[in-house]
Amino acid sequence: SDFARMPKPILKDNDLIQIINDNIKLVSELDRNIRIPFKTYSKKIIFKGDKEQLSRVFLNLVKNSIESIKQKEEKNPNFSKEISIEIIENNDHINITIIDNGVGFDILSNNIKDILHPYFTTKKYGTGLGLSIVNKILNDHNGKIEFIKINDGAKVEITFNLNDS
């Protein structure tokens, strides 16, 4: 499977802000009606990582947000669609938060932990590999991901620990 064949990351200095911006441009093509504000507090955040794999993480997460928003739009066509992204660098870690106002994690009720397991899916045609691959990439980059229920949508937090790298 794709999952077993994940290549080892090739770690090089990359600008996380640039990687996220590139992926925002990419997904903006999918739906021009979704606002994607990106809040940064520095010009660059250099991080030792695999550019391709990190791109895959952000692309996957933002695409999930878009699908969630589209699901909500079927029932409520007139809401203002938004995915907000924020990146903050502290001394020993980098935090990235992605918040969307889609259908949220309610469908998961108690299964929010299962979301990272291979082949677990709530989508009609989902493979259940997306988030497990995201999780593997983040683990390989000394990162972790958390899924947080919020009132009107979903919140995903990624933390890269800079101490052990």
Question: How would you describe each model-predicted region?
Answer:
Residues I66-N91:
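ATP-lid-like helix-loop hinge signature
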Residues R35-I45:
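Conserved catalytic submotifs in the C-terminal HATPase_c
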Residues G130, V134:
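Short alpha-helical Gxxx[C/S/T] motif in the catalytic ATP-binding
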Residues F105-P118:
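Short conserved segment of the HATPase_c
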Residues M6-P9, I46-G49, T122:
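Conserved micro-motifs of the catalytic ATP-binding
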Residues G143-K144:
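Conserved glycine-rich
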Residues L138-N139:
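Detector for a conserved hydrophobic position within an alpha-helical segment of the HATPase_c
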Residues I10-I24:
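A conserved beta-strand-to-alpha-helix junction within the catalytic ATP-binding
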